């Protein structure tokens, strides 16, 4: 067996869609967790849209599936239950409130830290929910908790 072909096949397989459940189930619960190609993800149903991201918060590995969804600056965010970090459902950006120390009377404004949480693609087909892992080449802070030594789930040997 050619090891190069095997590695290519494994890489392709990692980006195939995986059925994670039924649409009717997630609409009731508004969230669900799944393992997609050995990566734990959480899928949210919020305001008529589906969103999927790594299950562990980029900051300290908090369980995002246990967080509340709130709107900040017109963006729907999951709030990590451990340290209250705010992550946009649509883009995975971390949000924070900026305060100008030279003008204490100024109102704090919402700012982005950039993309911190890896977002995955969700598709609905014939009542089934499918998740495809992100192929984006950049590193996200949440990758630290989804891969390598801090990975929460173990692959079967």
Curated annotation (Swiss-Prot):
It holds the Pfam family Rieske_4. Gene3D superfamilies: Rieske [2Fe-2S] iron-sulphur domain. InterPro entries: Rieske_2Fe-2S, Rieske_2Fe-2S_sf, Sol_Rieske_ferrdox_dom. PROSITE patterns: RIESKE (PS51296). Its cofactor is [2Fe-2S] cluster. It comes from the Eukaryota. Keywords: 2Fe-2S, Acetylation, Iron, Iron-sulfur, Metal-binding, Phosphoprotein, Repeat. Signal peptide: none annotated. The modification Phosphoserine is found at residue 6. Residues 16-127, 17-131 form the Rieske domain. The keyword Iron-sulfur applies. The modification N-acetylmethionine is found at residue 1. Binds 1 [2Fe-2S] cluster per subunit. PANTHER family: FERREDOXIN-RELATED, RIESKE DOMAIN-CONTAINING PROTEIN. This is Rieske domain-containing protein.
């Amino acid at each position: 067996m050619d090891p190069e072909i095997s590695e290519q096949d494994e890489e392709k397989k990692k980006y195939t869609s995986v059925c994670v459940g039924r649409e009717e189930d997630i609409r009731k619960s508004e969230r669900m967790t799944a393992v997609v190609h050995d990566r734990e993800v959480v899928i949210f149903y919020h305001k008529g849209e589906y969103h999927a991201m790594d299950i562990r918060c980029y900051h300290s590995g908090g369980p995002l599936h246990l967080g509340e969804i709130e709107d900040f600056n017109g963006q729907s965010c999951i709030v990590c239950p451990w340290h209250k970090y705010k992550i946009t459902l649509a883009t995975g950006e971390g949000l924070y409130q900026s305060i100008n120390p030279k003008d204490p009377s100024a109102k704090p404004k919402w700012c982005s830290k950039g993309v911190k949480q890896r977002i995955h693609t969700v598709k609905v087909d014939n009542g089934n929910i499918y998740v495809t892992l992100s192929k984006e080449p950049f590193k996200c802070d949440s990758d630290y908790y989804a891969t390598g030594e801090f990975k929460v789930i173990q692959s079967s040997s």
